């Protein structure tokens, strides 16, 4: 800037030239300058134009004063200049208007002896109008390339390029177009530049304040949108009003956590896995729901620690009925001092466990059935050999020593028998067979199932099958009495199935051992008798 100020005072003069040569020289320079700005239309111009030429005409001839101004070291893209364009536009607009009027009057007065006064004044009027219009556009800060040159330069017009008036960089950083002719001195230019940079700093501060205020407003709006889930919970009312027909859909039984319940319903026995509870009993959640994942992801609710009394009552209720109506669930929750949602979630989890154990038990029973079919194909005692407590009975039947596959299937059958909760009466009471101790006789389902009762019913199932097999082979030895039940007590009475007289007399002769292989159906045990009457009794025994 210091260099440019010092250059302002230097006005090297050129020798007098003829009037046509002067116009030709000016038109050539302006055309080159015009092409330069068209080529670099999207880039901010430098601080000063490479050529500023002002012409002063007199009656004695034409004298040309050309001042060549160098480019100081300055960044092309200065954000302060861009931001301060609108701030400094008002300062220069009035001053440029007076300078343009003064320049217009000087050109009209000095151009009277040049012979081209009408054309010169017309062109000057056009350019002054373009300058005013371009200064208004530049005050707004719009920089389209089409506004740089509203009309082409006439070759006889000697004023400076109008780009210095319409681009904010040219407006603020360049010397004004009439600096040489109208006498804008160094002090005025320095004051203008100082005011320009002060306005740029003020505009930058205002922009930062506006950005901070906008960010604060956006954060407040986001907090206002996300505030209701913080108070009421993300799913505050979901699942609190189940359908009147039942508890919940079977497809959504398993809920490892108390997801569908509001944490405000936790009782005194509730504990939190992530920080305990606050004073009101609500669980303290980790994280904030005002985050981006607050509305999309459910917060983990606290687990309920049930007491022994509550668990025993819930288990007894679950043995009676697997599904609760809304009224029954509310009564049970009131009785146990629990929330309705906690009882519902416990029932969902318990039903899932029940179904899983049922599937495992049925799978093991299917394995045992497949083993029975396998033994039928390749000989041996199919049922007593598979039962782990019938080693002596198998020896009495003349069974071969057990192999590895025998041991595997015996263990599978024992595991199936020891499964505690069977879903319903898988081995229903049969009137012709007296089942062991602790098991009710009759077609109705059992009131409850324990490990011993399940084992007794499974033992009676295999013993009745062995009795049917011995009835099919009258010449074979009779089965041995089974050992006592696991649950303790006397051995069950009447385990051997009586043979009806009419079926024994009317039975056909026994088939040879080469019977066709039965179908390996995992859903039900294979057929064990040729007698149609015994087959119908077996169908009555298994009510799945």
UniProtKB/Swiss-Prot annotation:
Compositional bias of kind Low complexity: 53-70, 106-131, 492-506
UniProt keyword annotation of Ribosomal protein present: no
Compositionally biased region (Polar residues): 283-293
Domain of life: Eukaryota
Regions of compositional bias (Acidic residues) in chain numbering: 247-262
Keyword Nucleus assigned: yes
Entry's Gene Ontology cellular component terms: nucleus
Sorted UniProt keywords: Developmental protein, DNA-binding, Homeobox, Nucleus, Sensory transduction, Vision
Record-given protein name: Homeobox protein B-H1
Species this protein is from: Drosophila melanogaster (Fruit fly)
Phylogenetic placement of the source organism: Eukaryota, Metazoa, Ecdysozoa, Arthropoda, Hexapoda
């Amino acid at each position: 800037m210091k260099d440019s100020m010092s250059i302002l005072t230097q006005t090297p003069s050129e020798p007098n030239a003829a009037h046509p040569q002067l116009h030709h020289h000016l038109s050539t320079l302006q055309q080159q300058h015009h092409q330069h700005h068209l080529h670099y239309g999207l880039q901010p111009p430098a601080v000063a134009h490479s050529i500023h030429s002002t012409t002063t005409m007199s009656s004695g001839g034409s004298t040309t004063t050309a001042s060549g101004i160098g480019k100081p070291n300055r960044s092309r893209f200065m954000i302060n200049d861009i931001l301060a364009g609108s701030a400094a536009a008002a300062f220069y607009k009035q001053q440029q208007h007076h300078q343009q009027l003064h320049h217009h009057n000087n050109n009209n007065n000095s151009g009277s002896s040049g012979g081209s006064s009408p054309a010169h004044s017309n062109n000057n009027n056009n350019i002054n109008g373009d300058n005013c219009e371009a200064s208004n556009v530049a005050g707004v800060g719009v920089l389209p390339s089409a506004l740089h040159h509203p009309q082409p330069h006439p070759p006889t017009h000697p004023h400076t390029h109008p780009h210095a008036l319409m681009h904010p960089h040219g407006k603020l950083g360049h010397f004004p177009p009439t600096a040489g002719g109208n006498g804008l001195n160094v002090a005025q230019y320095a004051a203008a530049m100082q005011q320009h940079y002060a306005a740029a700093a003020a505009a930058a501060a205002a922009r930062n304040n506006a950005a901070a205020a906008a960010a604060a407003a956006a954060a407040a709006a986001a907090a206002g949108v996300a505030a209701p889930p913080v108070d009421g919970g993300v799913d505050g009312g979901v699942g609190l009003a189940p359908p009147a027909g039942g508890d919940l859909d079977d497809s959504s039984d398993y809920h490892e956590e108390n997801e569908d319940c509001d944490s405000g319903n936790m009782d005194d026995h509730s504990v939190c896995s992530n920080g305990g509870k606050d004073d009101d009993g609500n669980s303290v959640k980790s994280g904030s729901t005002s985050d981006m994942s607050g509305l999309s992801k459910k917060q983990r609710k606290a687990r309920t620690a049930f007491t022994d009394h509550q668990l025993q009552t819930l288990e007894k209720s679950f043995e009676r009925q697997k599904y609760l109506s809304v009224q029954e669930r509310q009564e049970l929750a009131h009785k146990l001092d629990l929330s309705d949602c906690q009882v519902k979630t416990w029932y969902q989890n318990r039903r899932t466990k029940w179904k899983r154990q049922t599937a495992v038990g049925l799978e093991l029973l299917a394995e045992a059935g497949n083993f029975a079919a396998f033994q039928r194909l390749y000989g041996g005692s199919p049922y007593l050999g598979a039962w782990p407590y019938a080693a002596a009975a198998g020896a009495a039947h003349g069974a071969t020593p057990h192999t590895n596959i025998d041991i595997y299937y015996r263990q599978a059958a024992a595991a199936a028998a020891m499964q505690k909760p069977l879903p319903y009466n898988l081995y229903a009471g049969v009137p012709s067979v007296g089942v062991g101790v602790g098991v009710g006789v009759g077609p109705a389902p059992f009131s409850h199932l324990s490990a011993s009762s399940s084992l007794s019913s499974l033992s009676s199932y295999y013993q009745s099958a062995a009795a049917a097999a011995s009835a099919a082979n009258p010449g074979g030895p009779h089965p041995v009495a089974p050992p006592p039940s696991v649950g303790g007590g006397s051995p069950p009475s009447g385990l051997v199935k009586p043979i009806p007289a009419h079926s024994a007399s009317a039975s056909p002769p026994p088939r040879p051992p080469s019977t066709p292989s039965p179908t390996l159906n995992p859903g039900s045990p294979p057929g064990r008798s040729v007698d149609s009457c015994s087959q119908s009794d077996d169908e009555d025994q298994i009510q799945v």
